[in-house]
């Protein structure tokens, strides 16, 4: 990257359909750390690991574009619950009885919680619960019309990012 030496792509193991692990791709928006330990920490607002151009591509969701490769590989869908890190899947599966419901479908590049503005760091259990409830509703009420609505709302948020975008 121009402002931060290191690989162009960020790769991380995430939980996919049925909990099967896959490697998610993103444009790297944070400083590269050789240890990889920082990669396991969730990005936060004003994160010192993010460099200037990285903040820009995150705000406008440009860092997510490589996930279309994941869609072509069959690991992800355009719309679905966003995939979490495998470690988070394990913890959430213990805390939320119905958590595995969100893994009945492929994870999405965008999802119901993201187009509702619930993106970014998880700052409270209530926010996490709200995201999961939206994912459960999506899985139980899937339709092509619902996917089209989510894609349209996501497109609007890419053009006019919400306050939660950083």
Which residues make up each language-model segment?
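C-terminal terminal-structure detector
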Residues: 96-166
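A short, structured surface patch at a secondary-structure boundary
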Residues: 43-106, 150-158
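Short, hydrophobic secondary-structure boundary micro-motifs
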Residues: 10-11, 79-81, 86-87, 124-127, ...
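Gly/Ser/Thr-rich helix-start
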Residues: 5-7, 17, 55, 75, ...
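A hydrophobic, helix-centered structural microdomain
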Residues: 1-33, 70, 144-166
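Short, glycine-rich, amphipathic interfacial segments at transmembrane boundaries or analogous
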Residues: 8-49, 110-133
């Amino acid at each position: 990257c121009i402002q931060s030496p290191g690989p162009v792509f960020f790769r991380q193991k995430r939980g996919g359909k049925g909990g099967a692990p896959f490697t998610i791709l993103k444009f790297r928006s944070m400083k590269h750390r050789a240890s990889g330990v920082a990669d396991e920490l969730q990005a936060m607002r004003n994160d010192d690991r993010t460099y200037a151009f990285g903040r820009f591509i995150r705000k406008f969701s440009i860092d997510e574009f490589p996930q279309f490769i994941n869609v072509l590989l069959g690991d992800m869908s355009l719309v679905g619950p966003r995939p979490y890190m495998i470690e988070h899947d394990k913890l959430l599966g213990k805390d939320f009885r119905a958590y595995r419901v969100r893994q009945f479908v492929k994870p999405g590049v965008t999802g119901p919680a993201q187009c509702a503005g619930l993106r970014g760091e998880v700052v409270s259990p209530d926010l996490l619960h709200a995201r999961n409830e939206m994912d459960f509703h999506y899985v139980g009420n899937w339709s092509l019309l619902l996917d089209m609505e989510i894609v349209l709302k996501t497109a609007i948020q890419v053009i006019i990012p919400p306050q939660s975008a950083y």
